[in-house]
Amino acid sequence: MSKTLSEEPYNKSHNCKGAVRRKGRKIIAKKFREADAILIGASNGLSITEGLHLFADNAAFERLFGDFKRKYGLGCILQGMMAGWPSEEEKWAFWARLIHHYCGQYQPTPVMNNLKAIVGEKDYFVVTSNGEGHFELCGFDPTKIYEIEGNWFTMQCARPCHDTIYPSLEVAEKLSAAEQSGHVPTELVPRCPKCGGPMDIHMGADQRMIPDTAAHARFQNFLKTYHGKKLVVLELGIGWRNQLIKAPMMRLVASEPNATYVTLNLGEIYITDNIKEKSFGLDGRLDELLPALREACEA
């Protein structure tokens, strides 16, 4: 028989009454306060909450990329990120505009400020498939962030002829300022300092993306440090099909006797049966759930 959060940790919060949800938040807050460390997993649900929707042909996409949409038939930001561009001048015009808008002009949002407040002074680590770099821009320590699919702040040789990654934010800002009619000047197009070939933003899941071995090593060291200790795994905006973050996180919780799993997502809560006794699931908008959790943690 299924039970509510007042009876056992596992909960699909949309099936619970308000009083039970409030009690659930208090239980979760207690877990945060008692935790030795917090492991944050984040995917596109967090980006969407902040106003960045890679998959949507929405008003924001029309405002930023309406000209690209009509010229190239792009249906969303992700299609532009994966496009085979006719020229490097056009490719970098797209990326410069994207990075300038979502990174160069970015200001920390309430959802990220609430997340920082929940973490407080505890040790933490962030594992994310989001490439826009908002964790770092909001003041999270970049040495405690593992962006498993790369990020927009760095670029690499497109071949690649070597495994060095280079900063791209300042370059993108210069390109954005120089862009005219969907093109950037040829002389400003980034070139590989080794082979002279084209450069790509350091992101993606194919074999050409240079892996961030240093960040991966730091993540493994974090897990080693808190093995057997009270670790809260906080998952933000990740659907059940996610094999890059969600599946490994649940396996980690299953292997750690003192770990607690907290998943926040809109419209879909998935927790495997083998960890449900030490898991919490809250169904709702992150910009509503995180302030409520922050309030519970500070009570």
Briefly describe each language-model feature range:
Residues 1-299:
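Conserved catalytic alpha/beta core of Sir2/sirtuin-type deacylases, generalized to analogous enzyme cores
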